[in-house]
């Protein structure tokens, strides 16, 4: 029988993870990561972040995942820098890793970068850029990005005020599971 390739190892790891067999999942992810599979490295980061609570190791694996062009790994690394977890809080680095994640089509990275631009954290406040990153997040089916973009259209911040577009984005956010957006639609 042929040796499993990195993608197969990652998939086997995910099956084990879903069954809550974290020990077995870690072994598969370690093998996948050792073969330079970004998803395997990112999943190892998740294990150390969420299950084993070792943020130093989580940071190392997210960093390797990001280096291997895994958008989720870049986004998770950005989260650690934004939230002062395992690394010193650094919003400039958070923005950098969210930008990398977004460039790799990670919706969460785009959304988080939009939030940083919206609030002027780690980057200069820029509602036009916030709208751009929320829009990209929404295209990638990130519910918060759709809802936040709807909010910008509703208020006319960073984009021309357009209540029809606001409702369209709130509706998309609601369909993607954003309860706050669903509530906004109910109030109309």
Residue positions per predicted region:
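N-terminal segments that cap or nucleate solenoid repeat domains
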Residues: 1-43
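Terminal, low-structured helical/coil segments at or just beyond the last alpha-helical repeat
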Residues: 2, 172-188
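Short helix-capping/linker turns of helical repeat alpha-solenoids
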Residues: 4-5, 16-17, 34-38, 49-51, ...
């Amino acid at each position: 029988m042929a040796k499993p390739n990195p993608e197969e190892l990652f998939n086997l790891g995910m099956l084990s993870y879903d069954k809550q067999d974290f020990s077995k999942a870690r072994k598969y992810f370690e093998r996948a990561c050792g073969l330079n599979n970004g998803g395997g490295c990112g999943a190892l980061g998740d294990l150390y972040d969420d299950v084993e609570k070792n943020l130093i190791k989580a940071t190392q694996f997210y960093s390797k995942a990001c280096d291997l062009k895994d958008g989720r790994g870049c986004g998770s690394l950005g989260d650690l820098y934004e939230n002062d977890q395992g690394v010193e809080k650094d919003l400039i680095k958070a923005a950098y890793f969210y930008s990398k994640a977004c460039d790799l089509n990670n919706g969460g990275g785009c959304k988080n970068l939009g939030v940083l631009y919206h609030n002027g954290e780690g980057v200069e406040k820029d509602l036009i850029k916030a709208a751009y990153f929320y829009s990209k997040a929404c295209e990638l089916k990130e519910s918060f990005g759709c809802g936040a973009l709807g909010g910008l259209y509703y208020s006319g911040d960073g984009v021309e005020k357009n209540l029809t577009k606001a409702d369209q984005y709130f509706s998309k956010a609601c369909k993607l599971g954003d309860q706050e957006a669903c509530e906004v639609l109910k109030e109309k």
